[in-house]
Design a protein with these regions (language model features):
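Detector for outer-membrane/organellar transmembrane beta-barrel domains
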Residues: 187, 193-320
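Cleavable N-terminal export/targeting peptides
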Residues: 1-26
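Transmembrane beta-barrel strands of outer-membrane/channel proteins
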Residues: 35-39, 79-83, 119, 171-175, ...
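Repeated loop/turn-to-beta-strand initiation elements of outer-membrane beta-barrel proteins
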Residues: 75-77, 113-115, 166-169, 202-207, ...
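Residues that define the transmembrane beta-barrel architecture of outer-membrane proteins
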Residues: 51-61, 98-101, 151-155, 188-192, ...
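Outer-membrane beta-barrel "beta-signal"
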Residues: 354-367
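Gram-negative outer-membrane beta-barrel proteins
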Residues: 39-47, 85-91, 123-127, 177-181, ...
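Outer membrane beta-barrel
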Residues: 23-42, 51-176, 188, 197-204
C-alpha cells in the first residue's frame, strides 16, 4: 500500500488538514488523515470466496499529527505521530501500539540533512515504495517486493542527506527492530537500511539495501535476511512508467512475510530462511483519463528452492487493472480487479499453488 507516500506528504506539510494550529510565528501542528473503505469480492482457489467491506482498497486508513518548530539559524525541530485503523469496525490496525505507523522526533537543517529518532519506515521502504503505481489492497508492489511493503521498525534512527543536484542519500539503524526490549543490544533484532535516490522532474531512480541481524536466528538459517532493490519511473505526461527489480535472501527483512512454517518471526517459509533467494520484477503504467487515471501493474517473484515434498517452488505473479476518479482534491473513487497465481493473502508463495482473484470498488478521502 502507498502508506509511505502519504506519510511523506504529511511530514513535508503538503497534505491538506482539517486542523492546523500555529502556536507562534515559528511553530505549527497539523492533524491529517485518510479514510478509505470499499466493497470487494475475493476468491482463493480451494478456499472459496468472500465478500464484504474492504479497509484501504487504495490506501490504508490512518490519522496522524505532525509538527515543526523553527529553531533559528536554519535549524528546525519536527515530529510525527501516525496510527492506522479499520473504518469498517472502528478498531486500531495494531492493538498493541497507539502509533503503529510512526512515532518519531527529529532535527533538520538544509545543509546537514534530516535526523529522525523513533518508530518509522526504513530508508529502503520509503525509497522503494515511491516506485509503486497501483497500491491495491494486498495486491500492490508489496505483494512481491516485501522490502517495499507497509512495515516500520521500532527504536530506529534515520538520517536523510540534503538534496544535491537531484541526489539524496539515506541511512538508518534500528537497535531493536521488533521491540523485544532485551537489555543487551545483541539480544535484540537489529536492522540497517541504506538508500540512494535521484529525482529530477519526471524522473525518479532509487537503489536500496537492507539487512537484519536476528537476535535468535532459526535453526539452519542460511544467513542474515537482506534485500536489494533498484528501479526507476518516468512521467511522460501522457503515460507514467515504473520499472523495478529486487533480490531478497534468507527471509524477509521487513518481518512481514507471514509465518507458514511456525518460525514465529514473519520471515516467510522455512525453505526461504534456510538460504533461499527471491528475485522479483515489477512493471507499472499509469495513463491519465479524464479527472482520474487507469492503473496497470504486473509483478513476478521467482523463488529458487524446493518444498519439503520435493516440488519446485513456483513463481508468484500479481496483475491488476484499476481506475481512480478524483471527485475533488481530497476525495477519490476507485475500482480495480486483480489476479495472483501461486499466491494467497497470507503467503507470498503457496505450496498448494493456489490462485487469488479480487474485484473491489470504494472511496478514499484525505483530510
Amino acid at each position: 500500500m502507498r502508506i509511505a507516500f502519504f506519510a511523506a506528504l504529511a511530514a513535508a506539510g503538503l497534505m491538506p488538514s482539517c486542523v492546523a494550529v500555529a502556536a507562534d510565528g515559528g511553530t505549527s501542528v497539523q492533524l491529517y488523515g485518510i479514510v478509505d473503505a470499499g466493497v470487494a469480492v475475493t476468491r482463493v482457489s480451494g478456499q472459496g470466496s468472500q465478500s464484504g467491506l474492504l479497509n484501504g482498497g487504495l490506501t490504508d486508513s490512518l490519522w496522524g499529527l505532525q509538527g515543526t518548530e523553527d529553531l533559528g539559524s536554519g535549524w528546525a525541530a519536527s515530529f510525527q505521530l501516525e496510527s492506522g485503523f479499520d473504518p469498517s469496525s472502528g478498531t486500531a490496525a495494531d492493538s498493541s501500539r497507539l502509533f503503529n505507523y510512526g512515532a518519531w522526533v527529529g532535527l533538520a537543517h538544509a545543509s546537514y540533512g534530516d535526523l529522525r529518532l523513533g518508530r518509522q519506515y526504513t530508508v529502503g521502504q520509503t525509497y522503494g515504495n515511491a516506485l509503486e503505481i497501483a497500491s491495491w489492497k494486498d495486491m500492490g508492489m508489496g505483494a512481491t517486493f516485501k522490502a517495499s511493503d507497509n512495515y516500520q521498525f521500532s527504536n530506529m534512527v534515520n538520517w536523510y542527506s540534503p538534496q544535491w543536484q537531484g541526489f539524496q542519500a539515506g541511512v538508518g539503524y534500528a537497535f531493536d527492530a521488533d521491540g523485544q526490549n532485551q537489555f543487551r543490544t545483541n539480544q535484540n533484532t537489529r536492522a540497517i537500511s541504506l538508500g540512494l535516490k535521484y529525482e529530477d522532474g519526471p524522473l525518479l531512480a532509487v537503489a536500496t539495501w537492507e539487512q537484519l541481524r536476528l537476535a535468535t536466528p532459526p535453526a539452519q538459517a542460511g544467513g542474515r535476511p537482506q534485500a536489494f532493490q533498484v528501479g526507476a519511473s518516468y512521467d511522460f505526461e501522457v503515460v507514467k512508467v515504473s520499472l523495478a527489480w529486487s533480490r531478497q535472501r534468507n527471509g524477509y527483512v521487513g518481518l512481514d512475510g507471514g509465518d507458514p512454517d511456525g518460525l514465529g518471526l514473519g520471515l516467510g517459509p522455512a525453505a526461504f530462511v534456510q538460504g533461499g533467494t527471491v528475485d522479483a520484477w515489477l512493471v507499472g503504467v499509469s495513463v491519465p483519463a479524464g479527472p482520474g487515471a487507469v492503473l496497470v501493474q504486473w509483478s513476478l517473484a521467482r523463488p529458487d528452492w524446493r518444498w519439503d515434498n520435493g516440488m519446485t517452488a513456483r513463481n508468484a505473479q500479481v496483475a491488476t487493472l484499476g481506475y481512480t476518479y478524483d471527485l475533488s482534491p481530497r476525495t477519490t473513487l476507485y475500482a480495480f480487479a486483480g489476479y495472483a497465481s501461486n499466491y494467497t493473502l497470507d503467503n507470498q508463495f503457496d505450496p498448494g499453488n493456489a490462485h487469488t482473484t479480487r474485484i473491489g470498488t470504494g472511496v478514499s478521502h484525505r483530510f
